[in-house]
């Protein structure tokens, strides 16, 4: 499936346009291949997860916690750089949806609690 159509579908399903999280950078964080056939899911953006996704052949990773955190620019150090390197070298698209996965009554992480 084309990456942009998939992102549009996910954004619509999670109702991303209804309200924006003012503190976190949600949605597309790293741009990868234009075609997506394998998607890895996770909670937090750690190096091991990205390496496993690359080994598995994932074209996209969808996470709860964002790699880039807030919209406030921060310096990229070695830890963040190594994570980005795996994604960029393997052309893996990274999507994150913190607030939207917390609150969605059907698709969210807290769906059983709501």
Where are these predicted regions, by residue range?
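Hydrophobic structural segments
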Residues: 1-114
